[in-house]
Amino acid sequence: CGVGFVANLSNEPSFNVVRDALTALGCMEHRGGCGADNDSGDGAGLMSGIPWDLFDDWASKEGLVPFERTHTGVGMVFLPQNENSMEEAKAAVEKVFTDEGLEVLGWRPVPFNLSVAGRNAKETMPNILQIFVRIAKEDDADDIERELYICRKLIERATKSASWADELYFCSLSSRTIIYKGMLRSEVLGQFYLDLQNELYKSPFAIYHRRFSTNTSPRWPLAQPMRLLGHNGEINTIQGNLNWMRSREATIQSPVWRGRENELRPFGDPKASDSANLDNAAELLLRSGRSPAEAMMMLVPEAYKNHPTLSVKYPEVIDFYEYYKGQMEAWDGPALLLFSDGRTVGACLDRNGLRPARYWKTSDGFVYVASEVGVIPMDESKVVMKGRLGPGMMITVDLETGQVLENTEVKKNVASAKPYGTWLQESTRSIKPVNF
């Protein structure tokens, strides 16, 4: 796969960010796969901040008031092809939102150009709509995201017995981020979704992904980015990870869910791809109160034992990994992961280090990460920092502060937030080896 992101350190939404991401994505075509028609891509997609100017413009044309941005969730939804099934699915979605006390503001048909899609993509293409909902009962931004997460889980549960259940899929449902994706080649994603050509589509960041399908056959929902992650690689431990997630479902609790943990289960889906299940696990940790960097460190730890730098300079990072090693098995395999919750954008490489990732920062306040260099035209004189991710390394961009943190800075901040070393000393019990 080919992945990358563009981020504006001033956190100013702009169309240029989206345009640069699409340019870079187009240069990643050789990293993806195509179907037998040589035109239907394994998948291509883009995650960004929500383009409120674009949606407010649509709302005004529809006679709607401008959206209350802090309390409005936007869902990018794949719906059944059959017209009657689509209406049933829409009604089921609306019922869950209404029952949860959310106000459904309307549905927006997503404009597209079908002529650039391949034959296989056209035959399997879902109806693509966006739903807008208002969340009045919550004021905290994280609680709003949790409410939308619960709603999506309830929708999945309410529709699982429907004949069209496999055709209903939320690419995203958030008040911060949105995802445009499909069974497309990278160079035509921006031509297919007409929104991506509109200069009102503005975002301070964009994650892009071109898929090469390995473990699962191409389908519209399996294009990436997923709801939190863009993944280049495979998770070779997926069966064990799913089994352990399932075994812990009954005991996982957090006060942030206010006793609603049962509504979140199941946490994994054996029918989904390895990337989708890793995304599910990351999203669960994020919505439970973890930061994106903390979630990535728990899921994809580096090879920390006998690490010369960590042992001497950052023992608190080793304490973090030791604390969580018995609570979360590593999702292992070649993996370059790009991630965002709309406030932080980042990338990390798993401990195998078998996927390329380059990054660079420019004097005009932009940070770029990509599977390879040369995907965006660049004035070299503007580059003030550059490097590559090695095994187990990470880089993050805080969009709200403009701070860029490289590897050990990220991990030190996460590991220093809690007294993991003290907890280990107080709670660890050694068991004598037993002869078998």
UniProtKB/Swiss-Prot annotation:
Ranges for domain Glutamine amidotransferase type-2? 1-400
Superkingdom field: Eukaryota
Which Gene3D superfamilies does the entry link to? Answer: Glutamine Phosphoribosylpyrophosphate, subunit 1, domain 1
Origin organism is Hordeum vulgare
Q: Name one GO molecular function term.
A: metal ion binding
UniProt-listed Enzyme Commission number(s): 1.4.7.1
Q: Which UniProt keywords apply?
A: 3Fe-4S, Amino-acid biosynthesis, Chloroplast, FAD, Flavoprotein, FMN, Glutamate biosynthesis, Glutamine amidotransferase, Iron, Iron-sulfur, Metal-binding, Oxidoreductase, Plastid
Required cofactor names: [3Fe-4S] cluster; FAD; FMN
The active site consists of C1 (for gatase activity)
- The name of this protein is Ferredoxin-dependent glutamate synthase
| Pathway the protein takes part in | Amino-acid biosynthesis; L-glutamate biosynthesis via GLT pathway; L-glutamate from 2-oxoglutarate and L-glutamine (ferredoxin route): step 1/1; Energy metabolism; nitrogen metabolism
Reactions it catalyzes: 2 oxidized [2Fe-2S]-[ferredoxin] + 2 L-glutamate = L-glutamine + 2 reduced [2Fe-2S]-[ferredoxin] + 2-oxoglutarate + 2 H(+)
